[in-house]
Amino acid sequence: SPEVMKSLSENFCKAMDQCKQELNLPDEVIKDLYN
């Protein structure tokens, strides 16, 4: 269902933000992952 996908992507974004902060990744690295 769309709601499941929405919560999954929200959780994924939260996890990515935490990883970014812990590893001090620049946003460019994140953009590379998405492309």
UniProtKB/Swiss-Prot annotation:
GO MF, one example: pheromone binding
Gene3D superfamilies, sorted: Pheromone/general odorant binding protein domain
Tissue distribution of the protein: Antenna.
Alphabetized InterPro entries for the sequence: PBP_GOBP_sf
Key words of the record: Pheromone response, Pheromone-binding, Transport
Top-rank taxon: Eukaryota
One GO process term, biological-process aspect: response to pheromone
Family from the record: Belongs to the PBP/GOBP family.
Function: This major soluble protein in olfactory sensilla of male moths might serve to solubilize the extremely hydrophobic pheromone molecules and to transport pheromone through the aqueous lymph to receptors located on olfactory cilia.
Protein name as annotated: Pheromone-binding protein
